[in-house]
A protein has these predicted regions:
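Acidic beta-strand-loop-alpha-helix segment within the catalytic core
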Residues: 1-83, 132-163
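Small-residue (primarily alanine) positions within well-ordered alpha-helices
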Residues: 4, 23, 108, 115-117
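Hydrophobic residues within well-ordered alpha-helices
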Residues: 85-89, 107-114
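Paired acidic/hydrophobic, glycine-rich loop segments that form the ligand-binding mouth/hinge
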Residues: 92-96, 119-121
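Acidic donor-binding loop at a coil-to-helix junction in glycosyltransferase catalytic cores
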Residues: 103
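Acidic, metal-binding active-site segment of PIN/NYN-like and related structure-specific nucleases
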Residues: 116-132
């Protein structure tokens, strides 16, 4: 992806980015936070819609691991808006496994990268826009964030890690 646009009509926030051109919120340049330690990071996630016991166990295992290894965890509803939250420093990191599809993450991926962040698969592998799995973070905590999540296996109702 080379262009990203995310608009929140309730707050009138327009996030935009073009590859190589920086990231913006309502025409003001934005950048990711500079938090350097996972233990000080504010993390966003979403719980998803699968309710089989094994998938719920995997989800709650990841949430527990994040609660134990970050400052705090938030669930606020939108993959794209959470990614923009990372891009502007409202969040230090975000991950979601099992969102709807590329429309939920492609624009956010461009915006986060142009704001100085990283976008990966939660396993640490390369981000796949069709994989329905995303992790984004400021440039300092990405690998520590992956380390926390990678210890918890995926649930059977979730898109699986790349091979």
């Amino acid at each position: 992806p080379v262009v990203g646009v995310v608009y929140n009509p309730i707050t009138e926030e327009m996030f935009t980015a073009t590859r190589g051109g920086g990231a913006y919120l309502n025409d003001e340049r934005i950048s990711c936070s500079q938090v350097e330690e996972m233990g000080r990071a504010l993390i966003g996630t979403e719980i998803g819609v699968h309710r089989d016991a094994a998938t719920v166990d995997a989800i709650m295992g990841r949430v527990r691991a994040l609660v134990e290894n970050s400052r705090s965890v938030r669930c606020s509803g939108s993959c794209a808006m959470n990614m923009c939250g990372v891009a502007m420093g409202r969040l230090d990191g975000f991950f979601e496994i099992g969102f709807g599809g590329p429309w939920d993450c492609v624009a956010g991926a461009v915006i986060v990268r142009e704001a100085g962040g990283v976008v990966l698969d939660p396993s640490g592998d390369k981000f796949d826009i069709y994989g329905r799995r995303v992790l984004c973070a400021n440039g300092n905590i990405g690998s520590a964030f992956v380390d926390v999540l990678s210890k918890i296996p995926d649930g059977p109702g979730e898109p699986q890690r790349p091979n």
